A protein has these predicted regions:
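Beta-propeller folds
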Residues: 18-228
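Sec-dependent N-terminal signal peptides
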Residues: 4-14
Length: 228
């Protein structure tokens, strides 16, 4: 709590959102600083008392809206603003020596005040997010695209042993999801446009050659390779 109060003291001297971001970024143990889409709130992910905590503050009033942290070993790896009042987290966990961390493949969503929480993906996915159609949310995943013009959905990339990654569109409030596509090549990197729509993929062939694929929705063969 003492460390949180020290944040507020510094915060009271800052007048603009640009200054807010720059000032907090110079503090020790800061992992990430992001301002909300409406510019009214700021999220500061930092280590406090040995734990990674995300503090959401009101820029105008200097008040802490909520401190987000996890128990039982999980910690916040990264966070995203889905809207001015909704957050997305990717989680990690410390190794046995507590000096190394590894991603758990869990994707979590909550309001900025800690309400309406749901584990969207990973081994702790909630029941309503577990199965829709032919896909299970109880798989390792990460955020692939935040879909900036859609405040209720994100694109999640799921992993499995086949290494042909899958993209799913997921509702950040109830976990319902619909499949977008499967990668045309192992360990592909997907490409998106400004609207958050997948437009292609990049990957390596068995002959160790880089191949670019153009995504064509609703066709029997969804990808066309480009000669490079």
């Amino acid at each position: 709590m003492k460390n949180v109060l020290s944040l507020l003291i510094l915060f009271s001297f800052i007048t603009t959102t640009a200054e807010v971001k720059n000032q907090f970024a110079t503090l020790p143990d800061i992992y990430s600083v992001k301002i909300s889409p409406d510019g009214k709130s700021i999220g500061i992910l930092r280590k406090i008392d040995g734990e990674r905590m995300l503090s959401i503050l009101d820029i105008q009033t200097n008040e802490v809206i909520f401190n987000h942290e996890f128990v039982r070993g999980d910690e916040i790896n990264s966070f995203y603003w889905a809207s001015e009042d909704r957050l997305i987290f990717e989680l990690l966990r410390a190794g046995r020596d507590t000096t190394r961390y590894f991603a758990t493949g869990q994707v979590y969503s909550t309001d900025i005040d800690g309400k309406k929480q749901i584990m969207l993906a990973g081994y702790n996915a909630k029941r309503e997010a577990v199965r829709t159609g032919q896909g299970s949310a109880k798989r390792p995943a990460q955020v692939a695209n935040m879909m900036p013009y859609d405040k209720e959905h994100i694109v999640v990339q799921f992993y499995d042993s086949s290494e042909f990654f899958e993209l799913w569109k997921m509702n950040i409030y109830n976990g319902r999801m619909s499949k977008i596509t499967t990668a045309p090549v192992k360990q592909a990197n997907f490409i998106f446009n400004n609207q958050g729509e997948v437009t292609g993929a990049v990957g390596m062939t068995l002959q160790n050659e880089m191949v670019y694929y153009i995504y064509k929705e609703n066709l029997p063969i969804e990808y066309d390779p480009l000669d490079c």
